[in-house]
Amino acid sequence: MDIQNIKETIAMIEEQNFDIRTITMGISLLDCIDADIDKTAEKIYQKIVNKAGKLVEVGNEIGHELGIKIVNKRVSVTPIAIIGAATAADDYTPLALAMDRAAKEIGIDFIGGYSALVQKGYQKGDEILIKSMPKALAATERVCASVNVGSTKSGINMTAVRDMGETIKIMSKGDKWLNAKLVVFANAVEDNPFMAGAFHGVGEADTIINVGVSGPGVVKRALEKVRGESFDILAETIKKTAFKITRIGQLVGQMASERLNVEFGIVDLSLAPTPAIGDSVARVLEEMGLETVGTHGTTAALAMLNDAVKKGGVMAAERVGGLSGAFIPVSEDEGMIAAVNSGALNIEKLEAMTCVCSVGLDMIAIPEETPASTIAAMIADEAAIGVINQKTTAVRIIPMGKEGEQIEFGGLFGVAPVMRVNKASSADFIARGGQIPAPIHSFKN
């Protein structure tokens, strides 16, 4: 093996904030379905504990052996709206409590899958789950929720969009963490390892391991060595760096899969930032030559970064999947926070950036007086970008405080500056309900 490659890998880990962001075990709950909600809850608890009981231990073991920090060990489950629909219950909070109890028992920080897939309409379980979401998330610490409101094949369920705007507004009256644990998707993927949007798709194996990597600091350091060079060299440098990052993710996933005796799923090629200095996607874009993220050229820089990461990573992994792109969460990226505070970055520019990356308007604080219809309209805009461009888009917004204030989350969630929102009304638009039809180019058969 090339000694230079070994040195570069050591530097990635020791100096450039490289880590494995998450090992996520996906668990099918289809065999937990029961007409009695209490029996269903107990089956859910038992299956999660039995399947993922050693997940944290194995993750720590692998991290210690390889000398790599594995930040999170997590679990995703089959969308609970499907599981709960077999019961006569009108509230699925007991199932969320079972998930939370299992998460605490096995020592993971988050469990995803309190979810509903409603891109083309509601089944009984979907409506019950969405109505119970504020109560379920308030009653639990580690449960994450998601709702898929649109897809390229189905269009956008605008009734669900309206309902999610109202749900987010209701939850904003509670703890700030409630909306940080809820993602509204279009074109949601079934093998996403990242929270809060992870759920285990019904087309997946009974139990799988998916891995999410993190490496903005590594990419930035590599780009520092090619300052002033052409975009051709820039793209090639990102590709080579992404290959190394993904290769480690592949190794960790294989080791976890073998030791847990679980099928290996995918490596998610996403670049996921943290609030730490030197671990920012925004700073990578600035290293390309932008004075600050948010200025003209930001969308082009992000498009190239996203594409080059995929091209480099896809050769390094057996199977890639998940969201696989650069994440641009505002509160979780110190460069994004700085750009918002300086006035260089606004919601409209972030929306443009979501056209070319993963995932969407992520961890953004907006004024608490923002009406539910405006929140729903923001979701509709993001869903439209995803549906028309055949990609995953999402919204995770926190209505809290006044414009200019800072909402402190701490840890990996960082600080969210409260951003300006257009005050003109979208209420009549959102009140229509119904379905925006699928785009013409969705008809592929």
Curated annotation (Swiss-Prot):
Signal peptide positions on this chain: none
CDD domains: RNR_PFL_like_DUF711 (cd08025)
InterPro entries: UPF0210 (IPR007841)
SUPFAM superfamilies from the UniProt entry: PFL-like glycyl radical enzymes (SSF51998)
Protein family membership: Belongs to the UPF0210 family.
Name of the protein: UPF0210 protein llmg_1581
Pfam families: DUF711 (PF05167)
Domain of life, per lineage: Bacteria
Subunit structure: Homodimer.
